[in-house]
């Protein structure tokens, strides 16, 4: 498999990056979920090697399902649709195309020495309307 075409040079110390898996273990167009310091992250690899990391939590429902979302595009923008209610999100920015009420949290991701690394800075909030406590990651 080819080297990813997208990575982030995020601020922070090297300890801010968490190794998730070997890059070669990811399948293009098939989302994978990872738990990083209590935060569920969805990894999405495109056939051209572009790699994205977003919250695995559906902003509309609070369910942890985005790794099973539908990968697509809107013009030149790569998208991920919720498998539940089909809200469509920009994988780069997290913007929701179908409702301004929602946004999908995105994370810096890179591949270093063949290992996928994600930078998660946890921000939590209470979401009682979703039955979710402080483990909810704000978008």
Each model region followed by its residue ranges:
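N-terminal pre-ligand scaffold of iron-sulfur
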Residues: 1-77, 90-91, 103-139
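Axial heme c-ligation environment in periplasmic c-type cytochrome domains
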Residues: 97-100
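Short cysteine clusters
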Residues: 58, 82-85
């Amino acid at each position: 498999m080819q080297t990813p075409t997208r990575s982030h040079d995020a601020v922070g110390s090297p300890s801010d990056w968490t190794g998730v898996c070997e890059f070669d273990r990811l399948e293009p167009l098939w989302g994978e979920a990872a738990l990083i310091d209590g935060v569920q992250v969805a990894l999405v690899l495109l056939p051209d090697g572009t790699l994205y990391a977003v919250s695995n939590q559906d902003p509309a429902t609070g369910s942890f399902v985005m790794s099973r979302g539908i990968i697509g595009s809107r013009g030149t923008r790569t998208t991920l649709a919720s498998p539940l209610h089909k809200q469509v999100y920009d994988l780069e920015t997290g913007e929701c195309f179908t409702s301004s009420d929602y946004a999908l949290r995105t994370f810096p991701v890179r591949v270093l020495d063949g290992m996928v690394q994600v930078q998660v800075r946890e921000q939590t909030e209470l979401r009682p309307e979703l039955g979710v406590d402080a483990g909810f990651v704000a978008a």
